[in-house]
């Protein structure tokens, strides 16, 4: 499942980070996907609905490409099973965030 998410994240994030022209810009560009990944996976693991996530994303006043990225991250997050206890939930959140950030950084190199 993580491999599928990794490939999905690369495909989703790559167009967003194409404009990054140096290592610092790459890190800055990758912070949005990383933070969004954490937010949507936290809601997923805490029992929030995907529909509510999509409504919240749609209400954000951000660039359309970032809104599209956020929607794709939410769909990917809800493809991961919800965990039954807080430690496993926290691990799933951290893993999803780390994979998103890593894949973004790889896409900018």
Positions of the model-derived regions?
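N-terminal signal peptide c-region/cleavage motif recognized by signal peptidases
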Residues: 14-16
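Compact alpha-helical subdomains of small soluble proteins
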Residues: 48-109
């Amino acid at each position: 499942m993580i491999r599928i998410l990794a490939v999905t994240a690369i495909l989703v994030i790559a167009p967003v980070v194409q404009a990054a022209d140096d290592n610092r810009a790459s890190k800055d560009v990758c912070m949005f996907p990383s933070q969004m990944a954490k937010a949507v996976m936290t809601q997923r693991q805490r029992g929030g609905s995907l529909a509510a996530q999509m409504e919240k994303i749609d209400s954000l006043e951000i660039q359309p490409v970032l809104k599209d990225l956020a929607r794709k991250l939410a769909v990917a997050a809800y493809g991961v099973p919800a965990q039954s206890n807080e430690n496993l939930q926290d691990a799933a959140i951290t893993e999803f965030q780390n994979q998103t950030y890593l894949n973004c950084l790889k896409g900018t190199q």
